[in-house]
From Swiss-Prot:
Superkingdom as given in the UniProt entry: Eukaryota
Transmembrane segments: none
Keyword line: Coiled coil, Nucleus, Transcription, Transcription regulation
Record-stated family: Belongs to the plant Mediator complex subunit 30 family.
Protein name: Mediator of RNA polymerase II transcription subunit 30
Sections of the chain in a coiled coil: 138-178
Subunit structure comment from the entry: Component of the Mediator complex.
Role played: Component of the Mediator complex, a coactivator involved in the regulated transcription of nearly all RNA polymerase II-dependent genes. Mediator functions as a bridge to convey information from gene-specific regulatory proteins to the basal RNA polymerase II transcription machinery. The Mediator complex, having a compact conformation in its free form, is recruited to promoters by direct interactions with regulatory proteins and serves for the assembly of a functional preinitiation complex with RNA polymerase II and the general transcription factors.
Length: 189
């Protein structure tokens, strides 16, 4: 499917590529939002929280020193992504895992499509420049090319901003997971 899309992006005009890029950017943002929503749903679902000690965490929490508790908390933080990945194999977990996996796959596909569109824009511009050198272009198309170049630059900047925002949200989510792990760990007296 991606190969077909890449080949069609090379035959599109720069304006069509810009519109396709905008569409792909919107899909990428929507998929990123779905990932965050799915993660939020998992965190808000108490049935997914580990209230009983598993064999591996029981061994680390029964230690008398604080470092064992810290390592159990760190394992809980690292294990959150493992938890969502292991649920896809039918290992158990909430229904939110399939939503998270679907959103993640959708995000990866839309980013790949967006990159293909952005990579095709320079090729389209080169083809347009070649046409202009051969006398097939017009001054109007130069203005159009400049406008589309600005739009492509704007799209790239918007992607960068959205990626920074998604990274910040993921960092906040990690902090929240760490807090939840701390609240769930047994108190040592």
């Amino acid at each position: 499917m991606l190969q077909k899309q890449v080949s069609t992006t090379t035959t599109m005009t720069t304006q069509e590529l810009a519109m396709e890029g905008e569409k792909q950017l919107e899909e990428t943002i929507e998929a990123a939002f779905q990932i965050i929503s799915a993660m939020n749903d998992e965190l808000c679902n108490p049935s997914l929280w580990s209230t009983s000690a598993t064999p591996s965490s029981a061994a680390t929490t029964t230690g008398s020193n604080g470092s064992a508790l810290v390592s159990a908390d760190a394992a809980a933080i690292d294990g959150t992504s493992h938890h969502s990945e292991s649920a896809g194999g039918g290992g158990g977990g909430g229904s939110g895992n399939s939503v998270l996996d679907e959103a993640s796959l959708r995000y990866k596909n839309s980013v790949t499509s967006l990159r293909a569109v952005l990579a095709a824009i320079p090729n389209s511009q080169k083809a347009k420049a070649s046409e202009m050198q051969n006398g097939l272009g017009s001054p109007e198309s130069e203005d159009e090319i400049e406008k589309l170049e600005e739009q492509a630059l704007s799209l790239r900047m918007e992607i960068a901003k959205k990626n920074v925002h998604v990274k910040e949200l993921i960092d906040k989510l990690r902090e929240l997971i760490a807090d939840i792990s701390t609240w769930q760990s047994p108190c040592s007296v």
